[in-house]
């Protein structure tokens, strides 16, 4: 749409917006030096268009003025904590703007429509349906790109999310229910869709989400492995809990690079949709929504793993209270740096690590194996949840910390998980029909293509990064903002 594109170019000029490329997100060495020079004066969460260049796993771990490092920020979970001999590395989302990697997925959805003019920043409102972090990322990116935004999320999400959104999003809509009530969010977006000025960026179906994670998160996890591997070690597995399933496409990249790597998808035991078509409410914020996302490449998924939400809640308290940290130091001998890094694990990040432990036990992985995952956000977004746990279970103590570690981490078993045969994968894929064809109006032929035509669907999406980068470079050249910086 040439008119929309022209409006976006003018808006970008007015607001000094430069859009980063996927290549720059993969490799920050490609970011122009004059952008880096300006970033030294910008805070990580500042509403400044330059922070688009911090949609990057390689950010320095600084709240203000940080640049980039060759290896992304990660936490390695020692065997004394995990109870398994293999190495578990978790890449941290805390050092993205908003403290969460969802700014990346939302960028992947918004940028293509912005640089083609399908989204007109002077007319459209960007609608971000989410169970929490994606709408935060979308609202933040919208603000940086000078677009109006509408955030939609369940009413029972953490207090911190709503407080932050009230300052950033143009409009915040709370839908009934908790984490797993995505149907209610979809109903609200369906209603908003009737207004042509509302453009929906649905992370559960937008192919920009897997495009970004495949090309950015997948490459970054590979960078971490290549930096830390010792002679004889192999990248044996990767696990990601599924909210929108965007991160699962990082696993697609890893499976191509490391043949033999097993890819696991995680969900809440209280809502085991993948495992046994189950449903229910749960407390692992950001995942598990009683449906199979359109963008989940189920055919390439090797294992389904269910995590008890009680495990992730109890460990949140272990890692984020003085009593818990004293236990980690005195009893396990963890150093202060690692204890600090364990606060980089939000609730779904903890669940991701637990998936890795269960996978390691199932496949009997050894010290020659490395399993990777990501930490969507950090404990910053869940301080109110820790207070609630104290109210529910009483004051914390070192003995309670020891018990939590024993029961909720060391005590994990290989129950509630399934190594997926072809027919299991097909069953899970078929569940997409009920959400996406019956309720959301997609075509059966498109659903079948996701299963039978890998080359024309998943591979084609993954390969679109170059085309998107060409459009972004053209957009930046036309605005002239980078030249004038």
Predicted regions and their residues:
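PLP-dependent amino-acid enzyme catalytic core
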Residues: 1-485
